[in-house]
């Protein structure tokens, strides 16, 4: 196998519409942030951004012909029911306690609705299940996947409205004299109180038994910004849904991890709507993470899939990775969980296809975005915080500059990064990103990145950028008189095309 070179052209616009001189002078004008923005501290040392693998690919790992390279993933766990003692534990409905719910065939389990559930029996069974699936209290993620009903009454729309109907019927059976309006109001109160009791109590039990696990619910928070058919779709979370999330303050305060999802359907393939959809779901998760304590937010781990939910044989393209992974990293979260069903590795030729996709598409992008994020964190935050967009709505990403860096896949199957950072790369970070300090750390944003001399960042199995920061090409003029130098520089910049630093968002893979 020869070497493969991945020329990542994801970097986005370096020069904006304000004029080329703005690029030269803006870094002298940017003030230090007057307010501190916080993010959750890393759960693993030297790991600004955490990659988590939650796909049942055991049969692919170690396969001599088509090994799956998981060296970039710090936490690996299978969602199989037989898997125990993993750093990532996913509790489905049948794996944690006696969760009251109604199945797709309308059969009621453990009371059906939470008001009829046996809470104490649920806790006893949940204790046994937690001790079974997490036998030791080691650091890890504990995600509860309860999707049958939602704790907010009004969010139980069709087909979940059977929970509302049965709740009203329960009230009417014990209070026949109530009007439908009165019965509905009482049903809302009973349902939401019982739902909260089950969800909040289960979190408290988990934290008591396994305090080193980060406990939370899959799909929480959500903001239902999925009306893609609206011609005015802008991705923003509806105000009413943000208000409903505010009313779930008890849930955010009880959670030690937040696990929103940004799975894509085929209609969002290489689509601007996907960018907006992911962006504002993550923005809402960041907002919610600070409800309990703005200076000590809850860590956010965003669920993604490598395939489209309604076309599971089709993998995400490079643009789709930017729309998901690129957005998540640029906004400043704790990590990404890649999940999928057993079919991903069990289809005919599933392992070879997954292996090739990871080798040529996913892993090179992980190398790219992780090293860029670490470089930015090291430059702006002295590794005491993570970089996040100054303006959340801007289309800027934490990517290596394709003019200066190549990512190579060597004959040994390892990745190597060629190239050195330049001052302009660091200035790009400083212009478009701010330092969001890690909680419980004293953090001050670097005011002048021109003073940064070295970059030393690594990812995975020793894939690193360790280099001196090179000056921008213009500085090689070494002017004898500053006025002559600035006149010459201004003349050169004036005649440069406005899009000189605008790169297409595609990846070129070539064999030298």
From Swiss-Prot:
Database matches in Pfam families: Glyco_hydro_56
Active site annotation, chain numbering: 147
Cysteines engaged in disulfide bonds, as pairs: 60-351, 223-237, 376-387, 381-435, 437-464
Compartment(s) where it occurs, according to its Swiss-Prot or TrEMBL record: Cell membrane
Keyword Ribosomal protein: no
Superkingdom, taxonomy of origin: Eukaryota
Residues forming coiled coils: none
Keywords: Cell adhesion, Cell membrane, Disulfide bond, Glycoprotein, Glycosidase, GPI-anchor, Hydrolase, Lipoprotein, Membrane, Signal
One biological process term in Gene Ontology: carbohydrate metabolic process
E.C. number: 3.2.1.35
Location (main, coarse): membrane
Stretch forming the signal peptide: 1-35
Catalytic activity: Random hydrolysis of (1->4)-linkages between N-acetyl-beta-D-glucosamine and D-glucuronate residues in hyaluronate
Residues carrying sugar: 46, 165, 293, 368
UniProt-recorded Gene Ontology molecular function terms: hyalurononglucosaminidase activity
Job description of the protein: Involved in sperm-egg adhesion. Upon fertilization sperm must first penetrate a layer of cumulus cells that surrounds the egg before reaching the zona pellucida. The cumulus cells are embedded in a matrix containing hyaluronic acid which is formed prior to ovulation. This protein aids in penetrating the layer of cumulus cells by digesting hyaluronic acid.
Protein family (similarity comment): Belongs to the glycosyl hydrolase 56 family.
Name of the protein in question: Hyaluronidase PH-20
The organism of origin for this protein: Mus musculus (Mouse)
Lineage: Eukaryota, Metazoa, Chordata, Craniata, Vertebrata
């Amino acid at each position: 196998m020869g070497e493969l070179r991945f020329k990542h052209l994801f970097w986005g616009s370096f020069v904006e519409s304000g004029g080329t001189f703005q690029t030269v002078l803006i870094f002298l004008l940017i003030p230090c942030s007057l307010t501190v923005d916080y993010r959750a501290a890393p759960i693993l040392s030297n790991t600004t951004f955490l990659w988590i693998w939650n796909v049942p690919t055991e049969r692919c790992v170690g396969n001599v012909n088509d090994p799956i390279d998981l060296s970039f993933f710090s936490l690996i766990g299978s969602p199989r029911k037989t898997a125990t003692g993993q750093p990532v534990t996913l509790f489905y409905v049948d794996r944690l306690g006696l969760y009251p719910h109604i199945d797709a065939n309308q059969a009621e389990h453990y009371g059906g609705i939470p008001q009829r559930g046996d809470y104490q029996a649920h806790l006893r069974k949940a204790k046994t299940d937690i001790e079974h699936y997490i036998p030791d209290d080691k650091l890890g993620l504990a995600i509860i996947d309860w999707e049958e009903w939602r704790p907010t009454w009004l969010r139980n729309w069709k087909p979940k409205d059977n929970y509302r109907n049965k709740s009203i019927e329960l009230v009417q059976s014990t209070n026949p004299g109530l009007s439908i309006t009165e019965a509905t109001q009482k049903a809302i109160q009973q349902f939401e109180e019982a739902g909260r009791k089950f969800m909040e109590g289960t979190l408290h039990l988990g934290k008591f038994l396994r305090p080193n696990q980060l406990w939370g619910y899959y799909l929480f928070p959500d903001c239902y910004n999925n009306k893609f058919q609206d011609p005015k779709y802008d991705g923003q979370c509806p105000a009413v849904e943000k208000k409903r999330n505010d009313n779930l303050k008890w849930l955010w305060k009880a959670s030690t991890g937040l696990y929103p999802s940004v799975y894509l359907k085929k209609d969002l393939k290489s689509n601007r709507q996907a960018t907006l959809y992911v962006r504002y779901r993550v923005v809402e998760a960041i907002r919610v993470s600070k409800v309990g304590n703005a200076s000590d937010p809850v860590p956010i781990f965003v669920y993604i899939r490598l395939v489209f939910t309604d076309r599971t044989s089709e993998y995400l393209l490079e643009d789709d990775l930017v729309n998901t992974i690129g957005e998540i990293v640029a906004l400043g979260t704790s990590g990404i969980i890649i999940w999928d069903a057993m079919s991903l590795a069990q289809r005919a030729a599933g392992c070879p296809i997954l292996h090739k996709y990871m080798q040529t598409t996913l892993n090179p992008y992980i190398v790219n975005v992780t090293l860029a994020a670490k470089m930015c964190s090291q430059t702006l935050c002295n590794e005491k915080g993570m970089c996040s967009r100054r303006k959340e709505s801007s289309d800027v990403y934490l990517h290596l500059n394709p003019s200066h860096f190549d990512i190579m896949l060597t004959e040994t199957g390892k990745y190597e990064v060629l190239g050195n950072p330049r001052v302009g790369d660091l200035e790009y970070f400083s212009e478009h990103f701010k330092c969001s300090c890690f909680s419980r750390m004293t953090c001050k944003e670097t005011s002048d990145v021109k003073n940064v001399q070295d970059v030393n960042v690594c990812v995975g199995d020793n894939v690193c950028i360790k280099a001196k920061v090179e000056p921008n090409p213009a500085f090689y003029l070494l002017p004898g008189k500053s006025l002559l130098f600035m006149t010459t520089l201004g003349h050169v910049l004036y005649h440069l095309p406005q899009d000189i630093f605008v790169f297409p968002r595609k990846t070129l893979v070539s064999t030298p």
